[in-house]
């Protein structure tokens, strides 16, 4: 069974708001939509992709996770099988989602394509809920998977 090691991260403080401390390969850009809180281009040796951040958008965590899952169809890629996992640290709840297959398009990401993958996080603190979502070709996203997980977990707590 696929697993992801997010439970053993160390957490130091209880921030009320998220301020991403990003690696050098993350470039903050002007969000392409007013619905987006922020947006980053992440580059690696396989290519580049956008990580989109929403803040306090509608729907429950489960509704958003299910919507993201349903944006994919067909066979999953063994590098990025469906994983949905929740952890809580210092009063902050993290919901991690990974999925792959054929991307059917979604809000602000209407281009359909095959061999796609998604990494998503929903981070809930006492005041806000942040939604992090990246969709890209499997090999491109897989190369940055641990980098994304580490950055979001370490910056959110």
Please tell me what each predicted stretch does.
Residues 45, 56-58, 100-104, 127, ...:
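Solvent-exposed coil/turn segments that connect beta secondary-structure elements
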Residues 23, 62-69, 119-120, 145-153:
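Extracytoplasmic/secreted envelope proteins and their assembly/folding machinery
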Residues 32, 66-123:
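Signature of long, low-cysteine stretches enriched in small and polar/charged residues
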């Amino acid at each position: 069974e696929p697993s992801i090691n997010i439970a053993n991260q160390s957490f130091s403080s209880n921030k009320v708001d998220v301020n991403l401390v990003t690696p050098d390969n993350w470039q903050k850009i002007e969000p392409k939509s007013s619905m987006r809180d922020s947006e980053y281009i992440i580059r690696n040796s396989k290519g580049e992709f956008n990580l989109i951040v929403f803040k306090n958008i509608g729907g429950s965590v489960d509704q958003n996770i299910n919507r993201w899952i349903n944006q994919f169809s067909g066979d999953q890629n063994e590098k990025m099988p469906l994983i949905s996992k929740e952890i809580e640290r210092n009063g902050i709840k993290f919901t991690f989602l990974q999925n792959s297959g054929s991307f059917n398009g979604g809000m602000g990401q209407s281009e359909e394509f095959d061999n796609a993958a998604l990494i998503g996080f929903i981070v809930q603190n006492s005041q806000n809920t942040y939604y992090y979502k990246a969709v890209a070709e499997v090999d491109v996203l897989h190369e940055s998977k641990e980098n994304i997980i580490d950055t979001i977990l370490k910056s959110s707590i």
